[in-house]
Amino acid sequence: MLEFEVLKTDARTGEGANAHPGSHARRGQLTLTHGVVQTPIFMPVGTYGTVKGVMPQSLHEMGAQIILGNTFHLWMRPGLDVMKQFGGLHRFESWDKPILTDSGGFQVWSLGDMRKISEEGVKFASPVNGDKLFLTPEISMQIQTVLNSDIVMQFDECTPYDTKGHITTESEARSSMELSLRWAKRCVAEFDKLENPNALFGIVQGGMYQNLRHESLEALVELDLPGYAVGGVSVGEPKEEMQRIMAHTPHRLPADKPRYLMGVGTPEDLVEGVGAGIDMFDCVMPTRNARNGHLFTRFGDLKIRNARHKADEQPLDTTCTCYTCKGRTMPDGSTSGGFSRAYLHHLDRCGEMLGPMLASIHNLHYYLNLMQEIRDALDAGRFGEFAARFRTDRLRGV
């Protein structure tokens, strides 16, 4: 099931002190099988059925409303027999809120020379044991039905920006986009055949070519799907190219359906994406960067392994209320005090497991809190003012 309601739009679209120029930002509510999601929303990525380094309890405490699972990797391990035994991904990973699963298309694309794409599907060697495997739109729908994810993504071909230095031509992008459209129709047919009660999203492709994006969008809209995603961005293209596609595509999708920007991105990308009309985001950046000592704060990014933090008694971000920065909440409402930059620097330099765990908690809290602040600003009709202040703060530096 899926119900989506737009609660408020950034109606002033560039007029007045609080407006965001050209804004298509909107505040919404998404009702799914396993719960209600307030949008715009960021979705933490749980590739193997876990958000790396973060306990489910911590995800609940920091306000995660929906997380991702990776169809391809869960198909490889633990496999469908185990998933069937548990009745899907929710019970398996002990998560009672909504889950979105990707189709496996991006992971197959990332295998490069290890895979062969045809009209029927993709043949490739398993990265786990080398077995020869075949993934089709139908099989992707079957896997995601077993996973019982609230949102199922169509199987698509992710159009690359370049391949070994060769920039994808319009002709190549068209061929890829049209294949994804044919696969989308097969996904719909199989999804309906399986009587999957959840929601299937289509994925707009077309590379960096606006005319192809428009054709893909129009063809997918004809399928009248519950929601739509913008795919094939943040795949190596210059930032200006992604921004050009974002200015063109999202607001042309149906206003009464949720819009999802796949695999993006930085805090700045999220704010710009909301302004472009996006409702949903996901990215591995908060946790991946955390594992590499790269932290996000209100006043810019911080590299905790730098020597200047060796004796720094400050928390990562004095404005942050996460466990890493503030510590436990005591019975009287006070906090126990968080961890210093010096301690986090020490953990990082020693390779201690707690280091990336605390860093991941902070980064995910930062992202989720950023989205809460965006929702609050939209509720108050002050998104433009918020976006301007956000940019100023981030440029200030830590």
UniProtKB/Swiss-Prot annotation:
<comment type="similarity">
    <text>Belongs to the queuine tRNA-ribosyltransferase family.</text>
</comment>
<feature type="binding site">
    <location>
        <position position="322"/>
    </location>
    <ligand>
        <name>Zn(2+)</name>
    </ligand>
</feature>
<keyword id="KW-0819">tRNA processing</keyword>
<keyword id="KW-0808">Transferase</keyword>
<feature type="binding site">
    <location>
        <begin position="102"/>
        <end position="106"/>
    </location>
    <ligand>
        <name>substrate</name>
    </ligand>
</feature>
<feature type="binding site">
    <location>
        <position position="156"/>
    </location>
    <ligand>
        <name>substrate</name>
    </ligand>
</feature>
<dbReference type="InterPro" id="IPR002616">
    <property type="entry name" value="tRNA_ribo_trans-like"/>
</dbReference>
<dbReference type="InterPro" id="IPR036511">
    <property type="entry name" value="TGT-like_sf"/>
</dbReference>
<feature type="region of interest" description="RNA binding; important for wobble base 34 recognition">
    <location>
        <begin position="287"/>
        <end position="291"/>
    </location>
</feature>
<comment type="function">
    <text>Catalyzes the base-exchange of a guanine (G) residue with the queuine precursor 7-aminomethyl-7-deazaguanine (PreQ1) at position 34 (anticodon wobble position) in tRNAs with GU(N) anticodons (tRNA-Asp, -Asn, -His and -Tyr). Catalysis occurs through a double-displacement mechanism. The nucleophile active site attacks the C1' of nucleotide 34 to detach the guanine base from the RNA, forming a covalent enzyme-RNA intermediate. The proton acceptor active site deprotonates the incoming PreQ1, allowing a nucleophilic attack on the C1' of the ribose to form the product.</text>
</comment>
<feature type="binding site">
    <location>
        <position position="320"/>
    </location>
    <ligand>
        <name>Zn(2+)</name>
    </ligand>
</feature>
<feature type="binding site">
    <location>
        <position position="325"/>
    </location>
    <ligand>
        <name>Zn(2+)</name>
    </ligand>
</feature>
<feature type="binding site">
    <location>
        <position position="205"/>
    </location>
    <ligand>
        <name>substrate</name>
    </ligand>
</feature>
<dbReference type="GO" id="GO:0008616">
    <property type="term" value="P:queuosine biosynthetic process"/>
</dbReference>
<dbReference type="GO" id="GO:0008479">
    <property type="term" value="F:tRNA-guanosine(34) queuine transglycosylase activity"/>
</dbReference>
<dbReference type="Pfam" id="PF01702">
    <property type="entry name" value="TGT"/>
</dbReference>
<protein>
    <recommendedName>
        <fullName>Queuine tRNA-ribosyltransferase</fullName>
        <ecNumber>2.4.2.29</ecNumber>
    </recommendedName>
</protein>
<feature type="active site" description="Proton acceptor">
    <location>
        <position position="102"/>
    </location>
</feature>
<dbReference type="GO" id="GO:0005829">
    <property type="term" value="C:cytosol"/>
</dbReference>
<keyword id="KW-0328">Glycosyltransferase</keyword>
<keyword id="KW-0671">Queuosine biosynthesis</keyword>
<dbReference type="GO" id="GO:0046872">
    <property type="term" value="F:metal ion binding"/>
</dbReference>
<comment type="pathway">
    <text>tRNA modification; tRNA-queuosine biosynthesis.</text>
</comment>
<feature type="active site" description="Nucleophile">
    <location>
        <position position="282"/>
    </location>
</feature>
<dbReference type="GO" id="GO:0002099">
    <property type="term" value="P:tRNA wobble guanine modification"/>
</dbReference>
<comment type="subunit">
    <text>Homodimer. Within each dimer, one monomer is responsible for RNA recognition and catalysis, while the other monomer binds to the replacement base PreQ1.</text>
</comment>
<dbReference type="InterPro" id="IPR004803">
    <property type="entry name" value="TGT"/>
</dbReference>
<dbReference type="InterPro" id="IPR050076">
    <property type="entry name" value="ArchSynthase1/Queuine_TRR"/>
</dbReference>
<dbReference type="GO" id="GO:0101030">
    <property type="term" value="P:tRNA-guanine transglycosylation"/>
</dbReference>
<keyword id="KW-0479">Metal-binding</keyword>
<keyword id="KW-0862">Zinc</keyword>
<feature type="binding site">
    <location>
        <position position="362"/>
    </location>
    <ligand>
        <name>Zn(2+)</name>
    </ligand>
</feature>
<feature type="binding site">
    <location>
        <position position="232"/>
    </location>
    <ligand>
        <name>substrate</name>
    </ligand>
</feature>
<feature type="region of interest" description="RNA binding">
    <location>
        <begin position="263"/>
        <end position="269"/>
    </location>
</feature>
